[in-house]
């Protein structure tokens, strides 16, 4: 029995072993930073492109995730989803709603006056998140949420074997340059990301035990970690 346990533990360590930071260049480590919060949520490896080692087991795991969470079953599906995220998948719907609710034309004082009439706590959080996202970023309101998932899908595409390593890295670096052009810093980018996550998840933003609060805590821990990609220069040249 003890031998079986040791064998299982050895196999587990092989499948889940973490890469060393030195194994990847700064540019790819920077890309890992763009989806680092979700990588940590998934208990995956922030030091490895793909967030896990290539293996049959991990390929099956990622294929199931892509199918169940994204309805992606082919390379063509993946290409389409990434392209859609890069130009904005949830962001356009967010803007449509913000316009419909009159959010985009309100000053802060006007918003604060209007929100007093809203009784439901969940709606107050929803509208406040929407107003603050638009006030901070305008038409890029939650684009960070879309772009973060685009780079992650590039990494998953590699593990799923829809892309070669070179194809996935080239796609991710191209998206990284878009991210740099749209946002000014890691804080800037992740502010948009969290506005988007709040919009998509409809989570309780005031509950310290909510998934939203957990992700914010992960982000703050990453910023405090000197070995985190979030401490790389935001304007790092993204080349191979």
For each feature predicted by the language model, list its residue ranges.
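C-terminal motif of bacterial Sec signal peptides marking the signal peptidase cleavage site
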Residues: 15-17
């Amino acid at each position: 029995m003890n031998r079986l346990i040791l064998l299982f533990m050895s196999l587990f360590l092989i499948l889940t072993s973490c890469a060393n930071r030195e194994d990847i260049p700064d540019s790819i480590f920077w890309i890992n930073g763009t989806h680092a919060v979700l990588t940590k949520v998934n208990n995956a490896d922030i030091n490895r492109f793909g967030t896990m080692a290539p293996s049959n087991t991990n390929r099956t795991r990622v294929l199931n995730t892509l199918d169940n969470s994204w309805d992606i079953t082919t390379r063509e599906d993946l290409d389409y989803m990434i392209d859609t995220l890069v130009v904005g998948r949830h962001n356009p719907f967010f803007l449509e709603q913000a316009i419909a609710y009159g959010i985009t034309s309100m000053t802060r004082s006007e918003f604060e006056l209007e929100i007093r009439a809203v009784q439901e706590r969940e709606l107050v959080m929803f509208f406040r998140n929407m107003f603050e996202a638009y006030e901070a970023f305008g038409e890029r309101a939650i684009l960070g949420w879309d772009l973060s998932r685009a780079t992650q899908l590039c990494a998953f595409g590699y593990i799923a074997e829809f892309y070669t390593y070179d194809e996935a890295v080239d796609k991710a670096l191209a998206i990284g340059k878009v991210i740099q052009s749209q946002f000014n810093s890691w804080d800037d980018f992740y502010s948009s990301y969290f506005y988007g996550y709040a919009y998509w998840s409809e989570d309780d933003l005031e509950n310290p035990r909510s998934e939203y609060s957990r992700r914010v805590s992960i982000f703050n821990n990453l910023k405090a970690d000197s070995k985190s990609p979030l401490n790389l220069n935001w304007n790092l040249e993204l080349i191979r």
